[in-house]
C-alpha cells in the first residue's frame, strides 16, 4: 500500500478489502487504538479474496456504536501514501453509505492534524 499509486491495478482490490474490513470492525464497535498498516496482517486466499488479522490488540476498545467522527479519528493513523489513504477513505464511505467526498475530506484533515501534532510532540521531546 505504500507503493500506491505505482501499482494501482494490483493494490485496488487489497485496499477495497481493507476498507471493508475496517468498516466491519467499526460496525461491530471495535476501536483499535493503534490502527496502522503495520498492525494489520493480510493473506490472499485461493479465491482472490483477502483475510485480515489485527495484531497489537492490547489497545482495543469495544463500544455499542461508533459515530462517523470516531471512525474517522480511528483511521487517521493508517500509515500509507496519502493517495492510498484517500482511496481507502472513499471505499470505506461507500460501505457506510455516506457522502464519499465529505468523508474523504474529513479523514484527510484528521490525518493532517494528527501528523502535525506528532511532529510538534517529536520536536518538543528533542528540545528537552
Language-model features and meaning:
Residues 1-33, 38:
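Conserved kinase catalytic-core helix
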Residues 34, 44, 61-63:
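Activation segment
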Residues 25-26, 36, 48-51, 74:
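A generic structural signal for well-ordered coil/turn residues at beta-strand boundaries
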Residues 39-55:
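Conserved protein kinase catalytic/activation segment
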Residues 50-126:
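C-lobe/activation-segment region of protein kinase-like
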